[in-house]
């Protein structure tokens, strides 16, 4: 059978990253777009001719949106086998039109239950019902229906439609369907774990299965053997190929895998935000920045430390465009990671044969358990995935932080948790200015961060400082004040908090407590 041309699309997303541009392109390709609730409003406000799902069902959205897509005219349009005459006749008799493309991502259940103040009622309201149902129907009928759950796949679908007379390829539809069942499996497991209380207390016994996925030449050092194993536990199965596709370069090493995990864990803090670039070396960020374009974000991240990025790993939260790729191409980097690569970018970057190019195909799972092996047993802990929002910040000084200071502090806090302790981090205008990582003394981390900034002539006046744990004494804060810092973000909780607060007030600093520590060993 020939690939079915996409004529009608059903779009309903919680994460609206890229959805306006995607649907605008679909409309230009002649696709009729139907949508629901907030997604419909977003599209119509952007001038896109999207119609309400109610025009298909003839039934309004009811019960605060709990019931809107659970309807025979939706699922019949998704599940009908186009080559089956009985299905086609029944569809015609019941006024059911085929739906060729489903674009759905789910209510953010995992992000919701990761909030420290989440209520049971909030958790329940964020259990998606209609979304998984549509995804599963579309994925089951992947012979005829294209299903997209991740904004990183928008570019791929559009490119195939342009090159294939409005259709996607069979192998693409199958790969996207596989992502659906992996997503819904993880989603249901997260709900079951939350309802069982498994997110808060490890069981007295666990069953974990490891299956070798990739062989490696050696481990952290040449004298150590190593491999990457697919892991199956109570949260499902996780493997490298579930989330990544290596597009170019020699085989990934043990150290590469550690750096990829570090880079992607950090860049995902900025999923759906402005263009952001993360540069990693030995699992620590040496530069992170956000800007209106990826190229500018890269240049700003690189300016934090102009030596460490050589041979490093760079991750992007938007598809890598030619301008940014050209800037990155000026130095040697081990790995570039992006959700997509725009036309011509891969061809240029592939000219350096030793560089690895990796496409992130889907978001890493949030929550779940983290395992660390020791010579005397396995340590198990919840992943450090809890989110601090602006509403969680407690201002403890006389001076309130400005909006710009709050924005910089939130940016710094997202990065801080991904740096080896002890961590002191200086940020200004959504750019790292000085990174002090992995020191036994918090004072030494502060000195290193200041020294790194001075080495590249970055002026710390007007910056903010983040500390992954409380300041045990006022000396660390006073050093930051001397450097020109105007605001401080830290967990709080020291027996000398009052002393530190007094020092902040004496220097007219704004300081906020997060109430959450981010040690990383």
Swiss-Prot record:
The reaction(s) this protein catalyses: (6R)-10-formyltetrahydrofolate + 5-amino-1-(5-phospho-beta-D-ribosyl)imidazole-4-carboxamide = 5-formamido-1-(5-phospho-D-ribosyl)imidazole-4-carboxamide + (6S)-5,6,7,8-tetrahydrofolate; IMP + H2O = 5-formamido-1-(5-phospho-D-ribosyl)imidazole-4-carboxamide
Pathway the protein takes part in: Purine metabolism; IMP biosynthesis via de novo pathway; 5-formamido-1-(5-phospho-D-ribosyl)imidazole-4-carboxamide from 5-amino-1-(5-phospho-D-ribosyl)imidazole-4-carboxamide (10-formyl THF route): step 1/1; Purine metabolism; IMP biosynthesis via de novo pathway; IMP from 5-formamido-1-(5-phospho-D-ribosyl)imidazole-4-carboxamide: step 1/1
Residue ranges of every copy of the MGS-like domain listed in the record: 1-149
A biological-process GO annotation: 'de novo' IMP biosynthetic process
Keywords carried by this UniProt record: Hydrolase, Multifunctional enzyme, Purine biosynthesis, Transferase
Family annotation (InterPro entries): AICAR_Tfase_dup_dom_sf, Cytidine_deaminase-like, MGS-like_dom, MGS-like_dom_sf, PurH-like
Its EC number(s): 2.1.2.3, 3.5.4.10
Any matching Pfam family: MGS
SUPFAM superfamilies referenced in this protein's UniProt entry, alphabetically: Cytidine deaminase-like, Methylglyoxal synthase-like
PANTHER family (UniProt xref): BIFUNCTIONAL PURINE BIOSYNTHESIS PROTEIN ATIC (PTHR11692:SF0), BIFUNCTIONAL PURINE BIOSYNTHESIS PROTEIN PURH (PTHR11692)
Protein name: Bifunctional purine biosynthesis protein PurH
Provenance organism: Chlorobium phaeobacteroides (strain DSM 266 / SMG 266 / 2430)
